[in-house]
């Protein structure tokens, strides 16, 4: 897991973000992007019980809404009424 996948990560631009707990800058990928001991999985479609059959690009199916539809694993789901953490 990476900082980018943490609930405490605040995206700033295409290269870096901010940890809401430590207030420190963290890179999206590469050196220093590994998750810390305070890691909590972010509410993303890929972390939901209703997300299934992702392909190699992270495109899968959401089965939690009235009508099944495609969804990206990295899509934010904090406001989704059907989100259920795995």
From Swiss-Prot:
Q: Which UniProt keywords apply?
A: 4Fe-4S, Iron, Iron-sulfur, Lyase, Metal-binding
| The keyword 4Fe-4S appears for this protein | yes
Give the molecular function GO annotations. 4 iron, 4 sulfur cluster binding; 4-hydroxyphenylacetate decarboxylase activity; metal ion binding
Q: Where [4Fe-4S] cluster 2 is bound, by residue?
A: 45, 48, 62, 80
Q: Which Gene3D superfamilies match?
A: 2.20.70.100
Name the Pfam families for this protein: 4HPAD_g_N, HPIP_like
Family, per the entry?
Belongs to the HPA decarboxylase small subunit family.
Quaternary structure, per UniProt, is:
Heterooctamer consisting of 4 large (HpdB) subunits and 4 small (HpdC) subunits, arranged as a tetramer of heterodimers.
Q: What does this protein do?
A: Component of the HPA decarboxylase that decarboxylates phenylacetates with a hydroxyl group in the p-position. Active toward 4-hydroxyphenylacetate and 3,4-dihydroxyphenylacetate, forming 4-methylphenol and 4-methylcatechol, respectively. Is likely involved in the catabolism of aromatic amino acids such as tyrosine fermentation. 4-methylphenol (p-cresol) formation provides metabolic toxicity, which allows an active suppression of other microbes and may provide growth advantages for the producers in highly competitive environments.
Q: Matching InterPro entries, A to Z?
A: 4HPAD_g_N (IPR041125), HPA_decarboxylase_ss_sf (IPR053727), HpdC_C (IPR040923)
Residue positions binding [4Fe-4S] cluster 1: 3, 6, 19, 36
Task: List the NCBIfam families.
Answer: glycyl_HPDL_Sma (NF033716)
From which organism does this entry originate?
Answer: Clostridium scatologenes
Which reaction(s) are listed as its catalytic activity?
4-hydroxyphenylacetate + H(+) = 4-methylphenol + CO2; 3,4-dihydroxyphenylacetate + H(+) = 4-methylcatechol + CO2
Listed transmembrane segments: none
Under which name does UniProt file this protein?
A: 4-hydroxyphenylacetate decarboxylase small subunit
Q: How is the cofactor bound?
A: Binds 2 [4Fe-4S] clusters per subunit.
EC annotation from Swiss-Prot or TrEMBL: 4.1.1.83
Listed cofactors: [4Fe-4S] cluster
């Amino acid at each position: 897991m990476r900082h980018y996948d943490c609930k405490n990560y605040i995206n700033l631009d295409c290269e870096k973000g901010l940890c809401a707990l430590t207030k420190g800058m963290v890179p999206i990928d590469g050196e220093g992007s590994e998750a810390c001991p305070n890691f909590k999985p972010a509410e993303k479609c890929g972390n939901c019980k209703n997300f299934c059959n992702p392909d190699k690009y992270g495109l899968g199916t959401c089965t939690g809404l009235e009508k099944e539809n495609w969804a990206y694993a990295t899509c934010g789901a904090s406001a989704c009424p059907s989100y259920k953490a795995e």
